[in-house]
Amino acid sequence: MFETHKVEIEWAGRPLKLETGKIARQADGAVLATYGETVVLATVVSAKAPKPGQDFFPLTVNYQEKTYAAGKIPGGYFKREGRPSENETLVSRLIDRPIRPLFPDGYKNDTQVIITVMQHDLENNPDVVAMVAASAALTLSGVPFMGPVGGARVGYINGEYVLNPHLDEMDESTLDLVVAGTQEAVLMVESEAKELPEDVMLGAVVFGQKGFQPVIDAVIRLAEVAAKEPREFNPEDHSALENAMLSIAEDELRNAYKITEKAARYAAVDAVKAKVKEHFLPEGVENPAHTAEEIAAVFKHLQAKIVRWNILDTKSRIDGRDLVTVRPIVAEVGILPRTHGSALFTRGETQAIVVATLGTGEDEQYVDSLTGMYKENFMLHYNFPPYSVGETGRMGSPGRREIGHGKLAWRAIHPMLPTAEQFPYTLRVVSEITESNGSSSMATVCGTSLALMDAGVPLAKPVAGIAMGLIKEDDRFAVLSDILGDEDHLGDMDFKVAGTDAGITSLQMDIKIEGITEEIMGVALNQAKGGRLHILGEMAKAISESRGQLGEFAPRIEVMNIPVDKIREVIGSGGKVIREIVEKTGAKINIDDDGTVKIASASAKEIEAARKWIHSIVAEPEVGQVYEGTVVKTADFGAFVNFFGARDGLVHISQLASERVAKTTDVVKEGDKVWVKLMGFDERGKVRLSMKVVDQATGKEVVAEKSEKKDGGEAAE
């Protein structure tokens, strides 16, 4: 019934198995990948023909994690998986980026890649396995895909590169880098690092590319026995149209791209485009030689050629800069004084307002992942409204791009944050992109660093980011610092580097062509370092280190530790005690399982009141100390006094006053405030208190000699 094919290799000390022919047989391509005991299913379906009028390639990559893969049931009311999590969105983008450039120009058939995590062994991260499975499924599917692609994770532990480290090993690693590519070229890099130098980062990329070569070989072996017949795809030849268009539009396009201001340049380009359209698609002509879609596509290609030629020939760019110059920068902090921290970062025509907010433990984000529930105390949200590029558009929940850009900035800042012990606050940063002409994610990195320092967060060092581009024709190439939006789209490589003056904290790289050598990548990384250091210098004009104190409107947090066996007493039955403390003091209180208590409030008085209350519950009273208490019950033999928080003790009738007492209620009544001294504990552990040795007016202990004399007299009686 099944015609199965299987390939198995040893990869980084664990077996990798690729299998096809048994599951999802109606898909164009389907591969079940097993690495260790992590199992991932990847499927590919591509429409037989493009939709009429389609002028782009509709590729969709959906990565999904099923909770049954880790033996769990989804939380929430409905108990089934819902919208994609942030991690699922990020992994979908991670897989999309290296495979998209490998589809030929002109292929516009609707294509969907679905990757499902079926089983997770809690040791091997499924994202790289998913990338390998998707590449294999595409290679087998028959669609025009110029793969296969391999992928690997690289760690850096004790000065050594580690291929595909286990999840628990990543805690020791100063690098988390994922690299993907073909046999000949690197296509994609995504990473977070702890201030590593450029040569170490480049070495990790090269190490990873070598590390995934056995995987590519395995996919090729599987394709040799299981691949479907390649689909016939003949891209249209538009060279004649392009040459004709070049002859009438080249000079005007070159002049348009000499205009440095974005809006004016776009207007000039649109005018040339309208002229071209009128020439090749005149009104009233039936059955024209070219469609509007063809003319638009060829004109776009021509734009790219003109810009690339100009840069390579003149070493001058669209806005008049040379290759290494960064656009003018203005950095400001404290622009929203009632927020906890704020910054305005402007670089040329790219601008971000970034706001930092400090919260408490109860503001942490709970993340339910396959590896278990954990809490995240640093959140960075990136918003890209349509007005930032002078357009109208959709508003609503963030898209994949916004989530991806936010995470890139998060990775850049995260290694420089203080530990929870050093700074017990939850941090949320929001970046509002108010203008965009390239590199808004790196503006977010710079703005976030400024806003956090403005908020008083003790960053280890300021962090800056820069977006770089590369244009290559034959043996000529040009590396561009601080690219514009147009240069981003027209280049052969774009990469974003963020870090401190000491090293890189985040690197994201996307390469669209082959032939980008290790030497070229090294030149690009070193040029990026110069740009990053320049930007850090400009940022330092606004603020160079964290403020010594929090903002006026930020909450204060005091941390205290209590014995674990006292947590129940502080919380109380059904949370009764802690609710009372919160209601009466006004402070927010968070208690961790290890006994760490965080008390937060904008008022120091409220924090101190809550701290004293909690201390009175958990601290043990000391023999010989004087405490204030309240009479809660009277009896013939004495009075019960509540003191030191929730503690009760007995003042025997003989200890109520220095003179003889006939009746307890002659001295005290329920509700009376009294001063008591802790005398000790009886043989059953009950508390023994005394009032007569304390001056009830002042709360001070009575002179010892006087007390002893009275004690002796009373005993004689």
Swiss-Prot record:
Pfam families: KH_1, PNPase, RNase_PH, RNase_PH_C, S1
Compartment list: Cytoplasm
SUPFAM superfamilies assigned: Eukaryotic type KH-domain (KH-domain type I), Nucleic acid-binding proteins, Ribonuclease PH domain 2-like, Ribosomal protein S5 domain 2-like
KH domain segment(s): 555-614
Cofactor: Mg(2+)
Keywords: Cytoplasm, Magnesium, Metal-binding, Nucleotidyltransferase, RNA-binding, Transferase
Main location: cytoplasm
Gene3D superfamilies per the UniProt record, alphabetical: GHMP Kinase, N-terminal domain (3.30.230.70), K Homology domain, type 1 (3.30.1370.10), Nucleic acid-binding proteins (2.40.50.140)
GO molecular function: 3'-5'-RNA exonuclease activity; magnesium ion binding; polyribonucleotide nucleotidyltransferase activity; RNA binding
Enzyme class: transferase
Binding site for Mg(2+): D488, D494
Enzyme Commission number: 2.7.7.8
Gene Ontology terms describing biological process: mRNA catabolic process; RNA processing
Recorded catalytic activity of this chain's protein: RNA(n+1) + phosphate = RNA(n) + a ribonucleoside 5'-diphosphate
Keyword flag GTP-binding: no
Domain S1 motif: 624-692
Disulfide bonds: none
Annotated GO CC locations: cytosol
Function: Involved in mRNA degradation. Catalyzes the phosphorolysis of single-stranded polyribonucleotides processively in the 3'- to 5'-direction.
Protein name: Polyribonucleotide nucleotidyltransferase
Gene behind this protein: pnp
